[in-house]
């Protein structure tokens, strides 16, 4: 393969100007290789003069009159000694069973390769061309043409004899002929003709354009693209001719077919051969000697171009200058282009060299991409066409890409590509890891190592972790978090981290990572110690997740120091695992923390921690006075004497006032408000809460010689105490601030009270009347009495079985019923006013009597 590629590079040197550098980056469309083996030996002693191509084999004619049959690798399978001079043309039928040969000395031979039948004829002039009928193997198509100074048609008649017909003469030598279907195309010195063998008519004459060129030096090239399309190349001119059926109404004396030139254009170079390639053309050029577009060393090299024909021109698709042997000595007539339609193979024949051009496949495309170091595109192309490529392997291309990236120093991209390229190949993975270690780039490949079902040996991961531990603590910590612990020997890594901690014992990154390693190893106590030491936010999650409450019983202070709120919530939520008494015991030397715990406990449940309420008094007094009074108000288990003692010691007046009032010493409490707080509003509020006339008297007595207090009392006591009592006790001549406003307010409040009382009275009267009327309406209604009702006294049916007899029934408005004789006082009916049952509960409306008798 390397030899072929080398030959291809030598054969496909671009003949473009150096300034057009971008063109050199275009991928060639064709690849080339020399036809070697037997051909090499033949051309060393002889020279190629012509060749024809069949799907099964090749037929090569030489200047020394020999014809060789070759396989497609160039090995000789048969040899024919035809003449001693140049073989001008070889023709094969479609089956490849018969061959026609003509030579410069006038010999023509047509024979079967596998039969004894044949035709041998010697002419007195050189025979330049020969063409067999494409279906020559069939008995009714035994026809061929030869061309020297005239074109002759040979046909075998029914007597098995050859009949000769002259198709054309008088216009010089016949230089080229091509037979396709029923159409024979040939070229002479004047132009190109087409003969329809079916209608026996010549249907066109396409004149040559440049008559100054010698036909023998620049021969015409003919090629059938299909049964109706002929391509003519002559000199620098290309014409594409379409054979069409003529409309019967226009025929008259004209041939049934005609030719239309659908495309015609000039080329820059002389045409030595043509071949179709789909809707494009492959053209073999002999380069003009005076071309300004070619460097001197390339001017005589033949070119093989792919062009796209247009109605009035063409577009060049690709162009390759071919370095054939002895190209400096060759002329335009020395080159030929033959093609194999089935495989798109193109043979460039020169006297000393035969080159095969073929379309490039996906393997060739990948070769070119690799040669241009376009590894990513090559890898993508291989992945897309992995079923079709034969010479390449996706993984090998990927490895070449990785090697290229490493050479460039793009280690991150190289490492990322390892995931895709190396796949599940453990050996390749390990080799790449060691290579990255050698170049000091383990960090680049670390994040792409397999960590799922596919895993490398633990030593590989440990090697990378040790490398990070030496150079990058943060990267090491990241790998520990991201890699599953099963990838490496956890104990070995723990030991390595501990060794580093000996040098840097306070390094938080290493400590945190060590805690994570301990956690994975289920040594939660060790991890918990580190988290608490670091005050790490994950400590509470660790405790909950792994149920480490038994491990924190002696670490409660550490937890509280880290985050009081979270710690207390956790302790209270898990009282079944860490008892309240244990927490209090642990916090006894840290009263500020104990207070936080007991305070939250009290907020959750006022009774759960009742045995600690006495201790909480001093804790509130010391650390949280704002919550002391609410605690005293809400606690039902607080010893009041102890609380009073503490509050008095600390001179907490408000708390002392509350405790005194709760203990029944309201007068002392009021005195403290008046004397120590000197706040008449609070004193009045306190008196209102207690609602005790004696307290009001004490308040008035204390305030009577204090004008500001009198003002406050006048403004606030109107709804609780008759203001006249206060006004009568004010000393004459005492100056009282805002007295007028206070008196106006008193009068206003009094009037408001009167109005409220009158309004309430009216409402009560109206409601009473409404209810009385409703009761009267209700009592006026009849009461249903039937056999289902019973006497509430004797519990027998209220109605007798014989209703014809006289009976008496007493029915009360409460719906209780009695036999008249069952009532306790069998006197006159007016003496029985109330239901015995209802009277025992209460006496009121609804217990009146209704009498029913018959």
UniProtKB/Swiss-Prot annotation:
Residue stretches of biased makeup (Basic and acidic residues): 1-13
UniProt KW Zinc keyword: yes
Membrane disposition: Peripheral membrane protein
Cellular component GO terms, alphabetical: clathrin-coated vesicle; cytosol; early endosome membrane; Golgi apparatus; HOPS complex; late endosome; late endosome membrane; lysosomal membrane
CHCR repeats: 568-712
Signal sequence interval, chain numbering: none
The organism's place on the tree of life at top rank: Eukaryota
Keywords linked to the UniProt accession: Autophagy, Coiled coil, Cytoplasm, Cytoplasmic vesicle, Endosome, Golgi apparatus, Lysosome, Membrane, Metal-binding, Protein transport, Transport, Zinc, Zinc-finger
GO molecular function, one term: zinc ion binding
Zinc fingers typed RING-type, residue spans: 791-839
Name of the protein in question: Vacuolar protein sorting-associated protein 41 homolog
Species assigned in the record: Danio rerio
């Amino acid at each position: 393969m390397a030899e072929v590629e080398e030959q291809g590079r030598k054969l496909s040197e671009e003949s473009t100007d150096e300034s057009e550098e971008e063109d050199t980056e275009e991928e060639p469309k064709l690849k080339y290789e020399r036809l070697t083996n037997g051909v090499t030996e033949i051309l060393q002693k002889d020279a190629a003069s012509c060749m024809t191509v069949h799907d099964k084999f090749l037929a090569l004619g030489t200047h020394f009159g020999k014809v060789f049959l070759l396989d497609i690798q160039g090995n000789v399978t048969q040899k024919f000694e035809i003449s001693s001079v140049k073989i001008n043309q070889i023709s094969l039928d479609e089956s490849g069973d018969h061959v026609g040969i003509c030579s410069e000395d006038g010999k023509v031979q047509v024979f079967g390769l596998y039969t004894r039948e044949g035709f041998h004829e010697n002419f007195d002039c050189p025979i330049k061309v020969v063409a067999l009928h494409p279906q020559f193997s069939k008995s009714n198509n035994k026809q061929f043409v030869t061309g020297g100074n005239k074109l002759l048609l040979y046909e075998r008649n029914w007597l098995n004899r050859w009949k000769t017909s002259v198709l054309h003469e008088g216009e010089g030598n016949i230089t080229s002929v091509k037979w396709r279907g029923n159409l024979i195309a040939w070229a002479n010195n004047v132009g190109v003709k087409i003969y329809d063998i079916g209608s026996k008519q010549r249907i066109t004459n396409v004149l040559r354009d440049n008559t100054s060129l010698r036909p023998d030096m620049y021969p015409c090239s003919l090629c059938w693209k299909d049964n109706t399309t002929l391509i003519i190349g002559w000199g620098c001119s290309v014409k594409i001719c379409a054979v069409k059926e003529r409309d019967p109404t226009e025929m008259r004396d004209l041939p049934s077919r005609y030719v239309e030139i659908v495309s015609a254009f000039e080329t820059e170079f002389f045409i030595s051969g043509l071949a179709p390639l789909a809707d494009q053309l492959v053209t073999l050029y002999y380069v003009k000697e005076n071309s300004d577009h070619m460097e001197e060393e390339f001017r005589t090299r033949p070119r093989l171009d792919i062009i796209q024909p247009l109605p009035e021109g063409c577009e060049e698709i690709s162009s390759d200058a071919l370095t054939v042997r002895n190209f400096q000595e060759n002329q335009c007539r020395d080159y030929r282009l033959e093609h194999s339609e089935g495989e798109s193979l193109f043979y460039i024949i020169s006297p000393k060299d035969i080159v095969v051009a073929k379309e490039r496949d996906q393997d060739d495309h990948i070769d070119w991409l690799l040669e241009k170091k376009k590894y990513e595109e090559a890898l993508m192309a291989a992945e897309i066409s992995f079923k079709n490529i034969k010479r390449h392997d996706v993984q090998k291309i990927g490895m070449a890409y990785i090697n290229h990236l490493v050479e460039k120093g793009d280690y991150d991209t190289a490492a990322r590509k390892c995931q895709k390229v190396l796949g599940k190949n453990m050996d390749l993975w390990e080799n790449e890891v060691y290579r990255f270690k050698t170049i000091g780039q383990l960090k680049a490949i670390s994040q792409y190592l397999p960590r799922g079902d596919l895993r490398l040996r633990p030593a590989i991961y440990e090697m990378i972790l040790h490398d990070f531990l030496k150079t990058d603590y943060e990267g090491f910590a990241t790998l520990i978090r991201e890699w599953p612990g099963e990838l490496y020997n956890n104990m070995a890594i723990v030991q390595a981290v501990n060794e580093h901690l000996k040098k840097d014992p306070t390094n938080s990154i290493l400590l945190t990572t060590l805690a994570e390693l301990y956690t994975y190893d289920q040594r939660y106590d060790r991890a918990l110690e580190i988290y608490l030491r670091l005050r790490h936010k994950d400590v509470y999650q660790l405790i909950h997740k792994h149920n480490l409450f038994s491990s924190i019983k002696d670490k409660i202070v550490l937890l509280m120091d880290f985050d009081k709120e979270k710690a207390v919530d956790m302790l209270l939520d898990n009282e079944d695992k860490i008892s309240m008494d244990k927490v209090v015991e642990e916090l006894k030397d840290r009263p500020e923390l104990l207070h936080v715990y007991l305070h939250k406990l009290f907020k959750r449940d006022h009774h759960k921690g009742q045995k600690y309420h006495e201790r909480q008094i001093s804790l509130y007094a010391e650390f949280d006075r704002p919550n002391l009074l609410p605690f005293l108000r809400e606690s039902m288990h607080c010893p009041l004497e102890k609380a009073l003692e503490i509050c008095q010691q600390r001179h907490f007046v408000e708390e002392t006032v509350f405790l005194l009032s709760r203990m029944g010493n309201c007068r002392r409490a009021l005195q403290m408000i008046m004397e120590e707080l000197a706040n008449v509003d609070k004193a009045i509020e306190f008196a209102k809460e207690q609602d005790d006339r004696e307290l009001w008297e004490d308040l008035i007595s204390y305030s009577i010689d204090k004008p500001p207090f009198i003002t406050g009392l006048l403004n606030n006591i109107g709804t609780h105490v008759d203001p006249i009592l206060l006004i009568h006790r004010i000393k004459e001549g005492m100056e009282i601030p805002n007295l007028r406003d206070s008196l106006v307010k008193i009068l206003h409040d009094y009037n408001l009270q009167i109005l409220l009382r009158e309004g309430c009275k009216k409402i009560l009267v109206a409601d009473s009347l409404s209810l009385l009327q409703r009761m009267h309406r209700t009592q006026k209604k009849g009461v249903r009495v039937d056999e289902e009702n019973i006497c509430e006294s004797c519990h027998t049916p209220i109605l007798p079985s014989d209703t014809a007899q006289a009976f008496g029934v007493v029915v009360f408005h409460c719906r209780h019923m009695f036999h008249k004789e069952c009532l306790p006082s069998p006197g006159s009916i007016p003496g029985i006013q109330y239901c015995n049952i209802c009277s025992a509960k209460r006496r009121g409306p609804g217990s009146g009597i209704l009498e029913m008798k018959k």
